[in-house]
Amino acid sequence: MNTNPASMAVIGAGSYGTALAITLARNGHQVVLWGHDPKHIQQLQQDRCNRAFLPDAAFPDTLRLETDLACALAASRDVLVVVPSHVFGAVLHQLKPHLRKDARIVWATKGLEAETGRLLQDVAREVLGEAIPLAVISGPTFAKELAAGLPTAIALASTDVQFSEDLQQLLHCGKSFRVYSNPDFIGVQLGGAVKNVIAIGAGMSDGIGFGANARTALITRGLAEMTRLGTALGADPSTFMGMAGLGDLVLTCTDNQSRNRRFGIMLGQGLGVKEAQDNIGQVVEGYRNTKEVLALAQRHGVEMPITEQIYQVLYCHKNAREAALTLLGRTKKDEKIGI
């Protein structure tokens, strides 16, 4: 047990949580990393690396592991939550009794609340109350590249100006990690959820063998869907041309480090949903996000035809090629109508 102060407590010891913890520690900050599985944390402590996901990224001396949640949270007022979206609310409930009175919460989770499709800010407010400062980071980041110290840029949005400035100072590294602040709290959250869905579609297109033209069309029209939904929810449309929108969308739609894209490729090649998920071996956020994003769009009367067809493939057993033909056969329209 170690209660020495830390600049940040990172909750979630998967690939991305570990990569962010390493990045913070390399910036010279004291960081404590906690995960839900004590055996996993003990193994990380023994190996001084995350051998399962990031075997080549050694832990800096300023990164310590913690199996006791209360101790991890007592060490820092600033808490970075990096867990799958479907357990986000449950994890916040777990954290709540142990948070310091001056705690501030930031998350790197991309997605919406399971079943309800609510933005994660609404979940956080419900669990933690209105007073606690909140923030979100999002953008084109693969954990392996981040942990390797390769150049990366993200967007940061917060409900609190001081928290935003403090986080930018903590995270920013002039050698490899650039952090752009953005006042659009809704837009930065939403981009990370919608891009997961479109990445599955881009993967399906490539799995079928449709080529670069089709993939690019899906990215472009997927961006239009993201922007339409964001605008309906009160986001700034320009956010979706930045790191949390177009940046993350292009990354996950074009590189096979993306689990969502690889999942889509397998579906396009004819594998079933369960088999494709098993082959990935990690959480495919876009699978749940598809249902949640579509439900959110329908509640707000927003047309999202690509998302609708991906939903049909994932949940209604529609063939991926048939879904593509449905999109191609839609009524002719002006590109600028409804974005």
Curated annotation (Swiss-Prot):
Annotated NADPH binding sites: 15-16, 36, 110, 143, 259, 283, 285
PROSITE patterns registered for this protein in UniProt: NAD_G3PDH (PS00957)
Cellular localisation: Cytoplasm
Gene: gpsA
Catalytic activity as recorded in UniProt: sn-glycerol 3-phosphate + NAD(+) = dihydroxyacetone phosphate + NADH + H(+); sn-glycerol 3-phosphate + NADP(+) = dihydroxyacetone phosphate + NADPH + H(+)
The keyword Lipid metabolism is annotated on this UniProt entry: yes
Protein name (database record): Glycerol-3-phosphate dehydrogenase [NAD(P)+]
Active-site residues, Swiss-Prot/TrEMBL: 195 (proton acceptor)
Native source organism of the sequence: Yersinia pestis
EC category: oxidoreductase
One GO-annotated biological process of the protein: glycerol-3-phosphate metabolic process
Record EC number: 1.1.1.94
